[in-house]
C-alpha cells in the first residue's frame, strides 16, 4: 500500500502518537491536521507515477486497474477515477469521508468523468458521514450518470471492516469483501 503521508514523515513518526488519539484530543487533532494536509489534488498527482510503475512492471497484468479506499481515502477513489478514467475500471470506497462537501473541489463534482464501476459503501451510524449525506450522495451519483452503486450497511459504525477495531462488525466486514471481490471480478477478471 502506498504511504499517503510520505511528505510529512514515515509510519509512526508523523508528529502525533497514534496510540493516544482515543484519549488525548490534542493528539487526535494532530492526526486530523495531517489527514487534511493530504489533499485530493496531492493524492491524484501521486497516482500517476504508481500507474506508470504498474504499467511497466512485467509481473503486473496488462489492462485496467482497480483501487479501494477506506475512510479518508474514499474521497481519493473518486478523484483518481475522475482524473484517470481510462485506467480505472473498478473503484470501491468504504465509509469514505469527504466524497461530498460544500467546497468547490468536492470529489463528487467530478464523478461524472468516471468510466469504471464505482462502489460506495457507508456505515449506517457514522459520525464522519452523517445521515443527510447518506441520502444526498446516492442522488449526486445518480445525477452524475455513472455506473455507481451506493450501499449503506445497517447496524454499522465507521471502521466496521477492521477486525482490530472495537466497532468491527463481522457480517458487514464479510459482505464488504464479497462486494469488493465481485466488483474486481466483473471489471478486472482477477
Label each residue range with its predicted role.
Residues 1-190:
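N-terminal cap/leader regions of alpha/beta-hydrolase-fold enzymes
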